[in-house]
Amino acid sequence: NVISNIMADFVQTRAASIISDRDVEVDISLTRSPVITATHLESHHKGHFVYKNISEDLPLPAFSPTLLGDTRMLYFWFSEQVLDSLAKVAFQDGRLQLSLAEAEFRAVLETWHFNPNQEIIPELFSASLTSPGRVTVHCPGRPTISCQNKGVVVSSPVVIEFLFPHKDGQDSVTHTFEEDIVTTIQASYSKKKLFLSLSDFQIKPKMASNMDEDSASIQSFLQLMITTVGIPEVMSRLEVALTTLINSKGLDLFDIINPEIISRDGFLLLQMDFGFPEHLLVDFLQSLN
């Protein structure tokens, strides 16, 4: 029992570091003492996110060890509440927004083989004749995340604005497009990188300003652009950002073997075998003194 408590505390400290960043921290303190059985060590943790030292205590979800297998070295079970709280603090911290200069926007379209030379694109920046315009994407409200057997479902309102600069330094909006997007995502981890794949999506336009009947083609263009460019580009950027974050905390030092990320109704399961880095093994053995 002493060894199990030391090991649980050691893993807890390392795990908390991996999923914390700047003003966003996570409280994964034990909810009860670890349990040792004939086949495994089991520990239960809170999983409460802390933003700017303010924590939102949530009711602990029901968990049963029967939800896990017994053929892998390590299992992590996450309630969907943990992922939903992560989306909340990411929104509060202003991380769910993107700004692209006009040239960057055109380059993104080209990257995804979406012809950036169509006549409709100059019309989007029609008021920006002397200075380059900008495109901004942000969430006006916080996204929600749920776990289902088909994948992790992310629902979010999204606003896209095309801006052009004034001489006074302020920006004016030429076009605004608002919609609700629901995506179903599968995740995997390989070669020390996180990969996200889109298995399903739904788009519900809510508002399109400055668009009369003569410019209805702009709305159609934007809807097509979002499905063929917008969603894949955001997922690609999330892959890079999340991989960079977790590897900056040392996750890439572990030899993670055949990891699986499995979504089920109400929870997310990570199962894997792994090799312990020598320097962390030394740290752990020293902590036994």
UniProtKB/Swiss-Prot annotation:
GO annotation, cellular component aspect:
extracellular space; high-density lipoprotein particle
Question: What subcellular compartments does it reside in?
Answer: Secreted
Organism (species):
Mesocricetus auratus (Golden hamster)
Its BP terms in the Gene Ontology are: cholesterol homeostasis; cholesterol metabolic process; cholesterol transport; high-density lipoprotein particle remodeling; low-density lipoprotein particle remodeling; phosphatidylcholine metabolic process; phospholipid homeostasis; reverse cholesterol transport
Q: Which family does it belong to?
A: Belongs to the BPI/LBP/Plunc superfamily. BPI/LBP family.
Glycan attachment residues as annotated in the record: N53
Q: Where does the UniProt entry say this protein principally localizes?
A: secreted
Write the protein's name: Cholesteryl ester transfer protein
State its role.
Answer: Involved in the transfer of neutral lipids, including cholesteryl ester and triglyceride, among lipoprotein particles. Allows the net movement of cholesteryl ester from high density lipoproteins/HDL to triglyceride-rich very low density lipoproteins/VLDL, and the equimolar transport of triglyceride from VLDL to HDL. Regulates the reverse cholesterol transport, by which excess cholesterol is removed from peripheral tissues and returned to the liver for elimination.
Under what conditions is it induced?
Up-regulated by cholesterol-rich diet.
Domain of life, per UniProt, equals: Eukaryota
Q: Which UniProt keywords are listed?
A: Cholesterol metabolism, Glycoprotein, Lipid metabolism, Lipid transport, Secreted, Steroid metabolism, Sterol metabolism, Transport
What InterPro entries does the annotation carry? Answer: Bactericidal_perm-incr_a/b_dom, Cholesteryl_ester_transfer, Lipid-bd_serum_glycop_C
- Which reaction is catalysed here? cholesteryl (9Z-octadecenoate)(in) = cholesteryl (9Z-octadecenoate)(out); 1,2,3-tri-(9Z-octadecenoyl)-glycerol(in) = 1,2,3-tri-(9Z-octadecenoyl)-glycerol(out); cholesteryl (9Z,12Z)-octadecadienoate(in) = cholesteryl (9Z,12Z)-octadecadienoate(out)
